């Protein structure tokens, strides 16, 4: 069974989990940091060029990284490719709106907000 590795948070893996649920793609949703983080440290050494989480590891052991790349790859695998340009636009619009939410109003806001010790906002 494919594995989705991410922290025990919604975060950047939420869209992947939602797609897998909707497309009936069975995954093992795993927290590699459970316990002493040894599993995560071992994986990072095995795949040093893969960056941070989330990771999607398919049945043959291939490691996919970058949440949006994982999401788009799984969407193609699940048959969520639009032939109609308008439907494709709506699909991309939903995708990008979700990204905007994550960046501006979602879970990442507290980490970058001056109110929570993040950098001061600048007017452009």
Language-model regions, residue ranges each:
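GST-like domain detector, emphasizing the conserved glutathione-binding G-site
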Residues: 1-123
């Amino acid at each position: 069974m494919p594995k989705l590795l991410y922290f025990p948070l919604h975060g950047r893996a939420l869209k992947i989990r939602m797609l897998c649920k909707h497309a009936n793609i069975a995954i093992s949703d795993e927290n590699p940091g459970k316990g002493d983080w040894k599993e995560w440290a071992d994986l990072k050494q095995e795949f040093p060029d893969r960056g941070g989480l989330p990771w999607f590891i398919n049945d043959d052991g291939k490691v996919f990284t970058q949440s949006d790349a994982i999401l788009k790859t799984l969407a193609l695998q699940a048959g969520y490719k639009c032939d109609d340009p308008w439907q494709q636009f709506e699909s991309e619009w939903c995708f990008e709106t979700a990204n905007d939410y994550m960046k501006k109003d979602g879970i990442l806001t507290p980490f970058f907000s001056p109110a929570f010790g993040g950098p001061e906002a600048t007017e452009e």
